[in-house]
Amino acid sequence: MAFFDIIIRKKEVIYMSLTAGIVGLPNVGKSTLFNAITKKSILMANYPFATIDPNVGVVIVPDERIDVLKNMYNPERVIPTTYEFTDIAGLVKGASNGEGLGNKFLSHIREVDAVVEVVRCFDDENIIHVDGSVDPIRDIEVINVELVLSDLEIVTSRINRIGKKAMTTKNKDDVKEIELLERIKEALESNIPVRKLGLDEEEKKLISSFNLITLKPIIYALNVEDNDINTCLLYTSD
């Protein structure tokens, strides 16, 4: 099966929906990207935290298989694949400790299936940068470190909660979970996201309830000048 799963019932053909969170530092173009994808018109302002509450838009995803399935099963209705995008408030250094709108931001991002991280790659003195200068590599590191620290807090809390119980009772499931969490904790302490650990499906299922952000797939969207797309190469050639 391709990227989207399909459920076929007697009277319905249902395409599964996915969600993505558009994230990044404040004022880097997240809302601009959201508007372009969803064709909405939310506020785009030249100051940090123009977005407070998350904006949500749903896009129907074209799929050529839909006509084939309609002809095969002749369903009474077809529910197409949709992709729900959420424009989330900007993240700043210290977000994992509640700086800016950090805690609120992180609670929203845990609910999505994938992360789209918008990174500014152009200079414009008329557009404010929260850190005073444009440095895409630094900006990516700021966000990724905060996501790692947020996951680390959750993993550490869980280890502290069931660690003693697992050592005392020797419960097989608890011991298995602790061993996996210790492995994840060690990686996070080395600034390694969970998605790079190569977890198998059983391991992912074991930690699924934690909604670890760094386990989610991530796409980097580089915001460049309209008339000079090659400016991104200054920051990505390495």
Where are these regions (language model features)?
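Short, Lys/Arg-enriched N-terminal segments with co-localized hydrophobic residues
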Residues: 3-15
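Conserved G1/Walker A P-loop phosphate-binding module
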Residues: 14-92, 103, 109
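Residue-level signal for inorganic ion chemistry
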Residues: 33, 69, 116, 155, ...
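Active-site flanking residues adjacent to catalytic metal/cofactor-binding acidic residues
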Residues: 86, 119, 222
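Short acidic, Gly/Ser-rich segments with clustered Asp/Glu that frequently serve as metal-coordination loops
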Residues: 91-92, 225-229
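Phosphate/Mg2+-binding loops and adjacent switch elements
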Residues: 96-219, 229
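Conserved small/polar residues in nucleotide/adenosyl-binding loops
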Residues: 235-238
